[in-house]
Each structure stands twice: as structure tokens, then as C-alpha cells.
């Protein structure tokens, strides 16, 4: 993705975007390494089109720093020009995304409107290296280490941009800012190359590396679900279906010669609490690092208003050949289920021999002290991640208190079309028609079938809009955001994303446009539901309090 005609004007606009809110005195921010010949650059893709309601998992190509503009330092952008033979080290990587408004203005979109579900930079000749989710963690390698790459190198770019609205015709840039230290001749000795070992609890062979963290999956009843540790081996136990999602990519065995771990920071989704790194040698296991989710969100672990902790500058781990590092991730399932969850931990690894590195088993006290000290944030609160519309009182009626007035669920079920459920569906906006919110009635024990007319077989990916039917706790009628509604209905059901994705989106969707709920059994009960992808979409169904033929008020 290249666009050389865009230069200083765009870079200046990006620079003026609202910065992260300053951290409090209790939340120190990790500083970046510094070198006399280091230069900071801003980079961005060409414009990426955004379709109504999209949640596409896509692949593109990019360069080390396309559309490069110097921010500070002695260098110039020619090191990234086509045909450049320059080599250098990336010592800091700060990802983000901006929307291109019709007048050319660049704005960081709010997470409840349009957000960067994930983006992964795949290194030339290697694997996943830099990445971001909505929390936008910065990579800040410690002094003396960097990721070595050519200035004109080709990279892969896997990205998933989630449009939570029905508005199309939008465009964004994926952006990143890097600190670049040039290689010299003879080769410099003050920076050692570090590469990434990508740990992923639900990665390969899955293309879309997710699992479900549901209420009731915590085997000890503590409300915390540790994946993959708490996935049962008994097929009759709740959560056994997640077993097939456990990936061998969650662990790595150190090759001959040993290794030094120099940096790590985890990625998880709302509901996630922490990502843990441990090492095993000769049957003994030692904890190395916990990447904690620091939620600014007043409601707790329910939104993207979060920053992740990374390892501190003095964190160095010396490993021997045959040692195995592994990761796990923990979710809070005490009050909601979290579908399509992630647990990823990119670990930067260098050659053995750093005298400051500590061996987990020979220097166990020092390693334990580093673990107990905990991590450090790479940035403060991001204004775009404040979930300000969630849980707003929209003055909408409680579906449980509305009479159905003869409305029934048709034998064909409920249709989804034009970003709405019908009958019984509504948009969570002020002033919505009360008559359309009235819940349709079914007989006790009925399973209701939904058909997504927004994503029928044969439609292209960009024509489709994928929706879910996910149970929520009544009244489920407050303002939409990341942290509301939550998947916490009295009957646990979730359809997955109904539609027909292809290529990298194959596993994002169910491969069907139809979903049928479990039986709805409780007489007189009004069941509410929403779409996880477009949470302004709501609906309800009422079970008749007496035989269907006698009618309902």
C-alpha cells in the first residue's frame, strides 16, 4: 500500500490528533530507548474503504514505512524509498488508525463507532511481528535491542476493521510511528537483533485465532476462566467444545544455543484480565511475566477502555536449549460470556549471552522479584476508547412491560434485514417506535429460527453484513457501546456471525445465514437479545403464559 503524493500535510494532521490521556502518578509509562542517530518516522497505508457494518478479516501488502514522514532526528525519509538499500533497527512501534473525513480531515474514530479489531504486520521472510488491537499497545524494546529490517522491505498486513454502524462510504488509514536506528558499516555493536516468537493460545491451525469464554466454563467456580488450562477433557463437561481451538502455537521450545527474552506484552479482548508467560525445564515450571489489563472503564472488564502492561526495561530472561515457554489467558466469566476471545503474547527473543539476563531456575529469586514487580503500561488512557455511549438511558420502554397485542413469531421465524430483526426488533436510539418494540409471542418450548437476509449465500463479502443473535439480560434497552449490552441472558445462546466469509474471513462466519435458538420454555418470560457486531440492534421474544390458542394481552 503506497501513496507517495500524501506527505507533510497528512503527517501534521496525524500529529494534531488527540493524544492519550496522561496517566496518573500511580501509572508510570514505559520510556523508549534512545540513540544519537535515531530518527522517528510516521507511516501509514493508502486509504482503506469501509463498508456498512463490515467485520472483514483481510490481507494486504505494505512496506516498512510507507508514506514516510520524519518527525524528529537526523535521518530523512529516503531510507524507505523504493530501491533503498538501507538497513536499520526498529526500536519502538506505535500503531493506530485514523478515519479520512470527506474534507480530508483525519480523526481517530471512537471505538464504539469504528475500530481496529486487529492488525498484524508480518515481517519479510518471517512471521507475525508487530500487532495491535483496540488497546494499541506500543512495542518499546529495551536499550541495546532492535528489530532489524530493510527500509524498502515488503511486509504482509492482516487487518480486521470493525464498523459497528450501518454507515458506509468511509475510509481509513492504518498508521504507525517508529523509532529507526540505521545500521552502519562496519555493523554497529550497540544494538543486538531481536526477533518475535508469537505465542497464541488459539492460533495455528486456526486462521481466526479465537475461542469462547463463557459463563460456567470456570471449573472451580471462581468466575475466572483460564484458557487453555480449564478446558475439560470430558466431552460431557461445559466448554469441551473449545478443546479443538487449543493451539500448539501457545508454546515454544528454545533451540540449541539458548536464548534471551527481552520484551513481551499481551493482547486480549473485553472481559480479559491478564495474559501469563511461564517456562518449563525438566518438569519444573516458573512464572516469568503477567501482562495485566489495566481498565479505566468504570464498569470494569467490559470494554476496550484498557491498556496492557509490558515488561520493564530491566526484564531479561536467560533460557537454555530445551526450555519451553508457554502462555495462558484469563477471562472474567462471572457476569457475562465473551465470544470470539483472544490471548496472544508476542515475545521478543535475542541470542543468548546478555550478562544482565537471569536464569529462571538458577536465579529464581531474581526472576521471582521481576515477576512480583509486575509490568508497566506503554501508554495512558486513549480518548477514542472511552465507551461513553454505553448504558445511556434512552428512555426506551422495557420490552417485558409492553403488551404484545397479538403479535406472534411467524412459523418461518424472525428475519434479519437492513440492520434490524423483524418482528420484535428495534434500534437502541431515542424515540424509537414503541409499537415495533413489542415482543412477539411463541408457545412454551419453541425454538425460534432467525435468517440473516443481509448475508445470503452468493452475495460477495462486501455486500454481506454479518450479524449475531446473542442473549442479553432484560430489559437490554440502554445505550449501545462495547460494554453494553453484555452476553448475560437467562438462557445462554449466541449464533456466531451469520454469513459466508471467504479466504481469511472463512472462520469469522458460521457459513450459514440461519440460526435456531435453544427452546424457550418459561411461561410468560420475555427473552431479550442483541447483535454483538452491531450492538444497537436489539430484539425480544415472549413465551405465552398459557396455551397459544387462548391469546395474549
Predicted feature residues:
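Bacterial N-terminal signal peptides that target proteins for export
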Residues: 1-9
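Extracytoplasmic copper-binding redox domains, predominantly the cupredoxin/blue-copper superfamily
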Residues: 393-553
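Beta-strand-centric surfaces of beta-sandwich/beta-rich domains
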Residues: 26-395, 401
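C-terminal segment of classical bacterial N-terminal signal peptides
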Residues: 15-23
Amino acid at each position: 500500500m503506497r501513496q507517495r503524493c500524501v506527505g507533510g500535510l497528512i503527517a501534521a494532521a496525524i500529529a494534531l490528533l488527540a493524544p492519550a490521556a496522561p496517566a496518573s502518578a500511580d501509572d508510570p509509562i514505559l520510556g523508549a530507548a534512545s540513540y544519537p542517530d535515531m530518527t522517528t518516522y510516521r507511516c501509514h497505508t493508502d486509504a482503506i474503504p469501509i463498508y456498512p457494518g463490515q467485520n472483514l478479516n483481510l490481507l494486504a501488502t505494505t512496506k516498512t514505512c510507507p508514506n514516510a514522514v520524519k518527525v524528529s532526528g537526523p535521518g530523512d525519509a529516503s531510507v524507505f524509498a523504493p530501491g533503498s538499500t538501507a538497513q536499520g533497527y526498529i526500536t519502538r512501534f506505535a500503531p493506530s488508525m485514523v478515519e479520512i473525513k470527506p474534507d480530508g480531515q483525519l480523526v481517530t474514530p471512537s471505538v464504539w463507532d469504528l475500530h481496529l479489531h486487529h492488525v498484524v504486520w508480518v515481517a519479510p521472510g518471517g512471521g507475525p511481528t508487530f500487532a495491535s488491537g483496540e488497546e494499541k499497545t506500543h512495542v518499546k524494546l529495551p536499550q541495546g535491542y532492535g528489530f532489524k529490517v530493510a527500509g524498502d522491505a515488503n511486509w504482509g498486513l492482516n487487518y480486521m476493521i470493525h464498523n459497528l454502524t450501518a454507515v458506509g462510504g468511509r475510509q481509513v488509514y492504518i498508521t504507525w510511528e517508529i523509532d529507526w536506528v540505521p545500521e552502519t558499516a562496519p555493523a554497529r555493536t550497540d544494538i543486538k537483533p531481536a526477533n518475535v516468537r508469537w505465542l497464541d493460545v488459539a492460533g495455528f491451525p486456526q486462521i481466526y485465532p479465537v475461542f469462547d469464554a463463557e459463563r460456567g466454563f470456570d471449573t472451580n467456580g471462581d468466575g475466572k476462566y483460564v484458557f487453555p488450562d480449564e478446558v475439560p477433557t470430558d466431552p460431557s463437561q461445559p466448554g469441551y467444545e473449545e478443546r479443538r481451538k487449543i493451539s500448539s502455537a501457545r508454546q515454544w521450545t528454545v533451540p540449541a544455543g539458548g536464548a534471551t527474552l527481552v520484551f513481551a506484552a499481551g493482547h486480549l479482548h473485553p472481559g480479559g484480565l491478564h495474559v501469563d508467560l511461564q517456562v518449563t525445564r525438566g518438569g519444573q515450571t516458573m512464572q516469568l511475566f503477567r501482562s495485566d489489563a489495566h481498565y479505566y472503564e468504570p464498569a470494569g472488564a467490559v470494554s476496550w477502555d484498557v491498556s496492557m502492561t509490558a515488561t520493564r526495561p530491566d526484564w531479561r530472561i536467560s533460557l537454555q536449549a530445551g526450555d519451553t515457554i508457554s502462555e495462558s489467558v484469563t477471562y472474567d466469566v462471572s457476569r457475562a460470556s465473551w465470544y470470539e476471545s483472544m490471548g496472544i503474547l508476542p515475545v521478543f527473543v535475542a541470542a543468548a549471552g546478555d550478562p544482565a539476563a537471569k536464569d529462571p531456575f538458577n536465579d529464581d529469586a531474581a526472576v521471582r522479584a521481576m515477576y512480583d514487580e509486575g509490568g508497566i503500561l506503554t501508554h495512558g488512557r486513549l480518548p477514542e476508547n472511552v465507551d461513553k455511549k454505553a448504558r445511556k438511558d434512552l428512555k426506551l420502554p422495557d420490552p417485558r412491560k409492553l403488551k404484545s397485542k397479538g403479535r406472534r413469531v411467524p412459523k418461518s421465524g424472525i428475519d434479519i434485514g437492513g440492520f434490524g430483526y423483524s418482528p420484535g426488533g428495534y434500534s437502541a436510539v431515542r424515540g424509537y417506535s414503541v409499537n415495533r418494540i413489542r415482543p412477539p409471542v411463541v408457545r412454551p418450548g419453541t425454538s425460534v429460527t432467525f435468517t440473516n437476509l443481509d448475508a445470503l449465500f452468493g452475495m460477495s463479502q462486501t455486500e454481506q453484513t454479518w450479524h449475531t443473535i446473542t442473549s442479553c439480560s432484560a430489559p437490554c434497552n440502554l445505550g449501545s457501546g462495547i460494554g453494553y449490552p453484555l452476553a448475560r441472558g437467562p438462557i445462554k445462546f449466541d449464533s456466531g456471525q451469520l454469513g459466508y466469509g471467504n479466504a481469511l474471513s472463512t472462520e469469522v462466519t458460521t457459513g450459514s445465514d440461519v440460526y435456531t435458538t435453544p427452546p424457550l420454555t418459561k411461561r410468560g418470560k420475555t427473552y431479550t437479545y442483541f447483535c454483538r457486531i452491531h450492538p444497537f440492534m436489539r430484539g425480544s421474544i415472549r413465551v405465552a403464559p398459557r396455551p397459544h390458542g387462548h391469546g395474549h394481552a
